[in-house]
Structures are given as structure tokens and as C-alpha cells.
Amino acid sequence: MSFYTLQAEAPTIVALYRAPAFIEFLAALTGQRLQPCPDNDPHSCALYFYTEPGDHIGFHFDTSYYRGARYTVLLGLIERSSSRLVCQLFKDDPQRQPRELQLATHPGTLIAFNGDKLWHAVTPLGVDEERVSLTLEYVTDPSMHPAKRLFSNLKDAFAYFGIKAVFRRSRSSKAAANPGG
């Protein structure tokens, strides 16, 4: 469920995402000056539902097209599953011994990381299991090259939220910003 849906249907979640005290806490945790992603980023604040057997996300980096770093914050909401967040620390670092963590995201569990640097996955959901996580994204620099914004929008449209959700929102955001033209 994208940021756009949460804005309309769950404003309290968006208020938490934007709360100055919460952002200050995360900045202290990461050692970075953080800010929310721009309003045209559907991943900035999103709910991810795992409800069908086999639901998972394979190993990946949270590739960011922002000019600065992007930090991912996961907040466990529902954890009735054997599914785990698997993190492989020090992947491709010849100076350090690789280490794997498998983390349950029980309700209230908060996990923060730089998604561009952490190789991670969510293991497959079992039968009659359910997992729901709130994902919050924060950046050190919210600017993005226009070509990378287009690529990011296409990825979001086809891999995550659907064409209508991504591009309808982009058009309505532009119209609101430029009502006369």
C-alpha cells in the first residue's frame, strides 16, 4: 500500500513518518541528517502485506536514485509467520568476515539500515501465515536527476504499485503545483 494511499486512508501513519521527534531519533541513530522523501515517492511510507504462501522478496539492495543516501526503517506490525528478514552483513567486503542475521519483525520491532549497502531478503511465507510491515524511507538529499525519476517511476509502476497509482499521482501532483498551466 503506497504512500499515496496512506495519505488518503491512514493520515496518522503519515504523521508518524513526518514527526520531527521521530526524524531526530533516526538522525541520532544513523549519524546522518535525515529528511522524509519527496511526496512523489510512493515508497516513502508504505505498508507491505505478505498474505499468500510463498510471498517473499529475494535478496536485493534498496537501490536509491536519490543523490544522497536513503535509509530504510522497518516497523513490524503483524508477525504471524516463520518468515524472516535476512541480512547479509559485509557482503563483498574483503576486509571483513561475512555475517548473516535472520530477524523476526514482531509488532513494534524497529529495524533501520542504509538499503544501498545492506544485502537483504524476506524469506517465503508459509501456509496460513501473515506478515505486515510498515516501511519508512528517509534521505540525506531529496534531489534526483529527472531521468532517474522516470526510471524509478517505471519500476514502481510495473513492480510495486501499478501504472495508475504511480502516474495518476504524478499528474495530480504536477497539476496542484501548476494550477494555471
Model region roles, listed by residue range:
Residues 1-5, 22-30, 156:
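Non-heme Fe(II) oxygenase metal-center motifs and adjacent flexible, charged/small-residue loops
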Residues 3, 38, 160-163:
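Intrinsically disordered, low-complexity regions
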Residues 120-121:
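Short, ligand-facing micro-motifs at secondary-structure edges
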